[in-house]
A protein has these predicted regions:
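Short, positively charged
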Residues: 1-33, 40, 44-228
Length: 228
C-alpha cells in the first residue's frame, strides 16, 4: 500500500513517503527519514496496524543495568538477588520496579539495611540506570522523581524526559503520531505535552522497561494511538 511505500529507505518509516507526496509543502528531510513541513522539522511515527513506536533506539546491555543494581547491593540485597546477571532475564517496567521493589524494600522516608537514606538511594539507582540510556541532564531529572511516593509521577517524568532526549538527539521541532487504521493524528511539541497526551488518552502505552528482558529498545517509552 502507499502508506508502506519507501519504508526503510534512508531510514524512512511507514507513511513518510506517502505524506511527502501529498503536498509540495511536505518534503523528506535530506539524508534521513524525517519530514520537513513548511520548513519545520517533523518526526513522524506512523501506526499502520497494532502497536506504535518507541522514542528511541539502541539502549544499554542488560548486564550493564544489573551491574548498577549490584553497586547498591548492601542496600537492596533482595532486589539484586531477583535480577540475576544474564544477556536475557527477568525484567520490570518503571511502575512495577517502583511499586513491587523499591516501595517494598526501600520505602520513602526509611533507612536501608546498610543504614542509608532510602529516598537518596532510590534517586541514585534511578539516575544511574537511566544514565545508561539517556545520559545527563535527562537521567538526573528522571532519577530525582524516584524520590516521589507516587509512581505515576516517576513514569510521567520519564516519558517527558525521554521525549526531550529524543527531540535533542534527532533535532526535530514537532512530533507527530498518526494512525492510518483509526484515522487519528496527535501532535506533540515538548515533553510535558507528551506526558499529558498519555494522561488524557490521546496516546496509549507509555510503558518502558527499567530493567529490560534482553531487548534494549524496551528502555524507551512506547506510544500507540487508541483505536476509535
Amino acid at each position: 500500500s502507499l502508506m508502506m511505500y519507501g519504508k526503510g529507505q534512508k531510514r524512512a518509516g511507514a507513511g513518510e513517503f506517502a505524506l511527502a507526496m501529498l503536498s509540495p509543502k511536505i518534503k523528506m528531510a535530506a539524508g534521513q527519514g524525517d519530514l520537513v513541513i513548511n520548513g519545520v522539522n517533523v518526526e513522524l511515527k506512523a501506526e499502520t496496524t497494532q502497536g506504535g513506536g518507541r522514542m528511541g533506539s539502541g539502549g544499554p546491555a542488560r548486564n550493564d543495568q544489573i551491574k548498577v543494581l549490584q553497586k547498591y547491593a548492601e542496600h537492596i540485597p533482595e532486589i539484586v538477588e531477583y535480577f540475576q546477571e544474564g544477556v536475557t532475564g527477568k525484567s520490570a517496567n518503571i511502575t512495577s520496579f517502583l511499586t513491587n521493589f523499591l516501595d517494598k524494600y526501600l520505602p520513602i522516608g526509611g533507612t536501608s539495611p546498610a543504614g542509608g537514606n532510602n529516598t537518596q538511594i532510590r534517586q541514585a539507582i534511578g539516575t544511574d540506570i537511566f544514565a545508561l540510556t539517556f545520559g545527563q541532564p535527562y537521567a538526573g531529572i528522571m532519577g530525582k522523581a524516584f524520590g516521589q511516593a507516587n509512581a505515576n509521577v516517576s513514569k510521567n517524568t520519564m516519558i517527558a524526559q525521554n521525549y526531550e532526549w529524543y527531540k535533542a538527539k534527532d533535532d526535530f521541532s514537532l512530533f507527530v503520531v498518526i494512525s492510518f487504521k483509526s484515522q487519528r493524528l496527535t501532535m506533540i511539541k515538548n515533553g510535558d505535552e507528551m506526558a499529558e497526551a498519555f494522561a488524557n488518552g490521546m496516546l496509549s502505552g507509555g510503558g518502558a522497561s527499567f530493567i529490560h528482558s534482553g531487548q534494549s529498545t524496551e528502555c524507551f517509552a512506547q506510544m500507540n494511538i487508541p483505536h476509535a
